[in-house]
Structure formats: C-alpha cells, structure tokens
Amino acid sequence: MANIKSAIKRAELNVKANEKNSAQKSAMRTAIKAFEANPSEELFRAASSSIDKAESKGLIHKNKASRDKARLAAKLG
C-alpha cells in the first residue's frame, strides 16, 4: 500500500474509476448482446448509443467502436 498521501488518494480514485468504467463497459456489452439475441431497430439504436458513449469516454478505441457498429448494422440487414 502507498505511504504518501497523494499516492493513497490516487489509488482510491483509481479504484472508483475502475468501477465506473467497468460498469459502463458492461452496460455496452449487455446492450450489444440484447441486440444480437433479438435484432431490431430499437435495440440497434440502443446498442449504437452505448457504443458511442463508451467511445466518447475513452473506454474503447474509435476504430473498435466503428467496427462494432458496422457489424451490428450488417446483422440488422
């Protein structure tokens, strides 16, 4: 464990950020899986939106976001 006050604070902040980022990524994956289970326009929009949010927050690379959305669009027909 860190001894310096600023290092302790950063460690605590990193734990909180990790929880927040993990939840956001999990929500994105859940939306994608919901679409894949039952492809519809409404679920496509929800999945696409969650991918865009993850991209804008830096959780996934912009190329991965684009690739994922293209694959979902192809499944939509």
Curated annotation (Swiss-Prot):
Transmembrane segments: none annotated. Gene3D superfamilies: Ribosomal protein S20. InterPro entries: Ribosomal_bS20, Ribosomal_bS20_sf. It holds the Pfam family Ribosomal_S20p. SUPFAM superfamilies: Ribosomal protein S20 (SSF46992). The keyword Ubl conjugation does not apply. One of its GO terms (biological process) is translation. GO terms for cellular component: cytosol; small ribosomal subunit. The keyword Cell division does not apply. Keywords: Ribonucleoprotein, Ribosomal protein, RNA-binding, rRNA-binding. One of its GO terms (molecular function) is small ribosomal subunit rRNA binding. NCBIfam families: S20. Binds directly to 16S ribosomal RNA. Belongs to the bacterial ribosomal protein bS20 family. This is Small ribosomal subunit protein bS20. The gene is rpsT.
